[in-house]
């Protein structure tokens, strides 16, 4: 199926060819060739108008010149108050003087948004358990996709997303921004160039989740909130703000960290939240982007709370065929970020603290790197630029828009994103099962472990989830 954007691109190319051959007069308006014409702007929709979309994704897509080539023209959320709030944020007119987001393009059911042929791509920023189904259905509808991390909650879901993107020839980008941030890129370059010798260990530090709010365990479903749709493939349970997202006084918008991020029915916790970012950098530094561990084991502490039950302190080890290990723990043990350790004790650290500067410290002790963008055990490791530099793409939301326009290549190839997602899922499963798991990365199966293999997909409520799409994807 040819999308609106692809039709415009091909039509412009055909007209340009006729101009070059003299088949049509040279005095043709620039808009006919698609230059700044309304039809040539990338039309985007948002599925999930909460914190991440409102504060990060939508503004980032539009900045750095993005406004010149894309518009958000449709919105969807099960909570219509959030749709209205996002519409106000995007208040404006298109090049023909029309409202960018019309009343007819504000939806409570995302499937209506996907059915709109005017939309070229969708930004999916919903609770984690919705990611796979929505991404697959968006690809099938001919939309390119920006999918928030984690990519999926199971290994089977991740493979199904990858299969759908390939089958329907869609650009699908995941929200792992460290591929576009200088300090993480340069740390990977230093490691891959052997500046710390053979890597024997990578330490990944992730934050803890917040304490549970003192909300009731059951509340009336708010007006304009489709609770059944919010639950999707998960079991039917009573509504409470402790399960979904908060609201401020008198129903005002509240874009604090949503409550669902702390419940195992809906997410995997920090192992796949911040872990999705840090594990990607760790795996990239080891050169295992298209590989996987041979085993994983882990333990964790599950907090005793009324409802919020994701893991607290964790201790997970992924072991690779090279002998290198990735170890993940909370920031009580490791600083938030990624530290590569070489066989002779040299190391490089990179973390969330802004961009690299010339004054970034070297020669600091490993327990003093918290809050630093990049640091190393001694001088000479991180100062010099890379002999073979890695790609320096633009900010990852804006990069997705550019990838839609040019049709690639992807700064974060989808196969690599799926492998990072798989690593996070493996860590979560090791904690849940409480034992060592042996993994065959090529077959994407556990070795001699029927119980673990039975968890490659989740149980799903009738009418929801990815299993209904497996046959069309050739996976059933």
What spans do the regions from the language model cover?
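Core domains of carbohydrate- and sulfate-ester-processing enzymes
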Residues: 203-253, 358-360, 455-460, 467-468
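Non-transmembrane alpha-helical segments in soluble domains
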Residues: 8, 62, 84-87, 111-114, ...
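Residues that mark the start of a beta-strand
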Residues: 41-45, 198, 325
